[in-house]
Amino acid sequence: IRLHKTNFKPYSKKKILKKIKLETKNSKLSINDGFEKMNKLVKLSKILVFTYPSTGFLEAIRSNVPCLMLWKNFDLEIDISAKKNFENLRKHEIIFTSEKKLSKKVNKIWNKIDLWWYEKNIQRNLRKFKNKYCNGKINLNKIYREINKIA
Protein backbone atom coordinates (compact mmCIF):
# COMPACT_ATOMS: atom_id res chain seq x y z
CA ILE A 1 0.00 0.00 0.00
CA ARG A 2 1.51 3.31 -1.06
CA LEU A 3 0.90 6.30 1.17
CA HIS A 4 1.34 9.92 0.23
CA LYS A 5 4.82 10.84 1.39
CA THR A 6 3.63 13.87 3.36
CA ASN A 7 -0.01 13.26 4.16
CA PHE A 8 -0.47 10.51 6.71
CA LYS A 9 0.12 12.27 10.03
CA PRO A 10 -0.72 11.80 12.93
CA TYR A 11 -0.34 8.11 12.12
CA SER A 12 3.04 6.57 11.57
CA LYS A 13 3.71 4.08 8.82
CA LYS A 14 3.88 1.41 11.54
CA LYS A 15 0.44 2.33 12.99
CA ILE A 16 -1.19 2.38 9.56
CA LEU A 17 0.26 -1.02 8.68
CA LYS A 18 -0.94 -2.49 11.98
CA LYS A 19 -4.47 -1.14 11.45
CA ILE A 20 -4.66 -2.42 7.88
CA LYS A 21 -3.33 -5.86 8.80
CA LEU A 22 -5.90 -6.13 11.60
CA GLU A 23 -8.76 -5.19 9.30
CA THR A 24 -7.69 -7.29 6.34
CA LYS A 25 -6.34 -10.24 8.33
CA ASN A 26 -3.51 -10.33 5.79
CA SER A 27 0.01 -10.36 7.19
CA LYS A 28 1.62 -10.17 3.73
CA LEU A 29 0.67 -6.53 3.12
CA SER A 30 3.37 -3.91 3.17
CA ILE A 31 3.34 -0.14 3.34
CA ASN A 32 5.32 2.18 1.09
CA ASP A 33 5.80 5.70 2.42
CA GLY A 34 5.73 7.29 -1.04
CA PHE A 35 9.48 7.66 -1.53
CA GLU A 36 10.24 4.35 -3.26
CA LYS A 37 10.29 4.17 -7.07
CA MET A 38 7.03 2.91 -8.60
CA ASN A 39 8.63 0.43 -11.00
CA LYS A 40 10.25 -1.38 -8.06
CA LEU A 41 6.92 -1.55 -6.21
CA VAL A 42 5.11 -2.94 -9.23
CA LYS A 43 7.56 -5.82 -9.51
CA LEU A 44 7.09 -6.72 -5.84
CA SER A 45 3.30 -6.41 -5.69
CA LYS A 46 0.24 -8.53 -6.44
CA ILE A 47 -1.90 -5.40 -6.48
CA LEU A 48 -1.24 -1.70 -5.97
CA VAL A 49 -3.46 0.19 -3.54
CA PHE A 50 -3.34 3.97 -3.73
CA THR A 51 -4.62 6.04 -0.81
CA TYR A 52 -5.10 9.21 -2.85
CA PRO A 53 -5.64 10.20 -6.51
CA SER A 54 -2.27 10.39 -8.20
CA THR A 55 -0.39 10.07 -11.44
CA GLY A 56 0.80 6.71 -10.06
CA PHE A 57 -2.78 5.45 -10.20
CA LEU A 58 -3.12 6.65 -13.81
CA GLU A 59 0.21 5.01 -14.68
CA ALA A 60 -0.92 1.71 -13.16
CA ILE A 61 -4.17 1.85 -15.16
CA ARG A 62 -2.24 2.77 -18.30
CA SER A 63 0.11 -0.20 -17.78
CA ASN A 64 -2.81 -2.51 -16.94
CA VAL A 65 -1.38 -3.26 -13.48
CA PRO A 66 -4.00 -4.45 -10.97
CA CYS A 67 -4.78 -1.55 -8.66
CA LEU A 68 -7.35 -0.02 -6.36
CA MET A 69 -7.65 3.50 -5.03
CA LEU A 70 -9.10 5.04 -1.91
CA TRP A 71 -10.40 8.53 -2.67
CA LYS A 72 -12.14 9.66 0.50
CA ASN A 73 -13.07 13.14 -0.76
CA PHE A 74 -14.14 11.99 -4.21
CA ASP A 75 -17.41 13.93 -4.28
CA LEU A 76 -15.73 17.16 -3.18
CA GLU A 77 -12.58 16.91 -5.29
CA ILE A 78 -13.66 15.42 -8.61
CA ASP A 79 -14.19 17.83 -11.47
CA ILE A 80 -17.67 17.57 -12.99
CA SER A 81 -16.20 16.93 -16.47
CA ALA A 82 -14.33 13.84 -15.21
CA LYS A 83 -16.93 12.57 -12.74
CA LYS A 84 -18.77 10.17 -15.07
CA ASN A 85 -15.58 8.33 -16.07
CA PHE A 86 -14.34 8.03 -12.50
CA GLU A 87 -17.81 7.04 -11.24
CA ASN A 88 -17.58 4.12 -13.62
CA LEU A 89 -14.41 2.96 -11.84
CA ARG A 90 -16.25 3.32 -8.53
CA LYS A 91 -19.13 1.25 -9.88
CA HIS A 92 -16.67 -1.49 -10.85
CA GLU A 93 -14.96 -1.37 -7.45
CA ILE A 94 -11.62 0.03 -8.52
CA ILE A 95 -12.09 3.36 -6.74
CA PHE A 96 -13.46 3.46 -3.18
CA THR A 97 -14.46 6.22 -0.79
CA SER A 98 -14.53 3.94 2.26
CA GLU A 99 -11.57 2.17 3.83
CA LYS A 100 -13.84 -0.61 5.02
CA LYS A 101 -15.21 -1.33 1.52
CA LEU A 102 -11.72 -1.21 0.06
CA SER A 103 -10.52 -3.64 2.72
CA LYS A 104 -13.38 -6.03 1.95
CA LYS A 105 -12.53 -5.88 -1.75
CA VAL A 106 -8.86 -6.69 -1.10
CA ASN A 107 -9.89 -9.68 1.03
CA LYS A 108 -12.37 -10.87 -1.59
CA ILE A 109 -9.93 -10.81 -4.53
CA TRP A 110 -6.62 -11.51 -2.77
CA ASN A 111 -6.27 -15.12 -3.94
CA LYS A 112 -7.58 -14.42 -7.44
CA ILE A 113 -6.40 -10.92 -8.35
CA ASP A 114 -5.53 -11.76 -11.95
CA LEU A 115 -8.86 -13.50 -12.46
CA TRP A 116 -10.67 -10.38 -11.21
CA TRP A 117 -8.49 -7.83 -13.01
CA TYR A 118 -8.55 -9.55 -16.40
CA GLU A 119 -12.28 -10.27 -16.33
CA LYS A 120 -13.88 -9.01 -19.59
CA ASN A 121 -16.13 -6.41 -18.01
CA ILE A 122 -13.33 -4.91 -15.90
CA GLN A 123 -10.96 -4.77 -18.88
CA ARG A 124 -13.63 -3.21 -21.12
CA ASN A 125 -14.25 -0.44 -18.59
CA LEU A 126 -10.53 0.08 -18.03
CA ARG A 127 -10.04 0.42 -21.81
CA LYS A 128 -12.72 3.12 -21.95
CA PHE A 129 -11.01 4.96 -19.11
CA LYS A 130 -7.54 4.55 -20.69
CA ASN A 131 -8.79 5.83 -24.04
CA LYS A 132 -9.98 8.99 -22.29
CA TYR A 133 -7.13 9.61 -19.83
CA CYS A 134 -4.16 7.36 -20.57
CA ASN A 135 -3.84 7.06 -24.33
CA GLY A 136 -0.68 7.79 -26.31
CA LYS A 137 1.73 10.55 -25.39
CA ILE A 138 0.09 12.28 -22.50
CA ASN A 139 1.02 14.51 -19.63
CA LEU A 140 -0.26 12.58 -16.60
CA ASN A 141 0.49 15.49 -14.25
CA LYS A 142 -1.67 17.81 -16.38
CA ILE A 143 -4.53 15.30 -16.40
CA TYR A 144 -4.21 14.84 -12.65
CA ARG A 145 -4.45 18.61 -12.11
CA GLU A 146 -7.51 18.84 -14.39
CA ILE A 147 -9.30 15.97 -12.67
CA ASN A 148 -8.64 17.45 -9.24
CA LYS A 149 -9.46 21.08 -10.10
CA ILE A 150 -5.89 22.21 -9.38
CA ALA A 151 -4.72 25.32 -11.23
Predicted features by range, described:
Residues 9, 13, 38, 56-58:
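Short, well-ordered alpha-helical microsegments
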Residues 1-34:
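Catalytic donor nucleotide-activated moiety binding site of glycosyltransferases and closely related
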Residues 3-5, 33-35, 71, 97-100:
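Residues at the C-termini of beta-strands that transition into short coil/loop
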Residues 34-45, 62:
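Short acidic alpha-helix that forms the nucleotide-activated donor recognition element
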Residues 131-151:
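C-terminal alpha-helical cap of glycosyltransferases
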Residues 7-8, 54-55, 136:
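Gly/Ser/Thr-rich loops at beta-strand to alpha-helix junctions
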Residues 18-26, 47, 52-133:
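Catalytic binding pocket for nucleotide-activated donors in carbohydrate/polymer assembly enzymes
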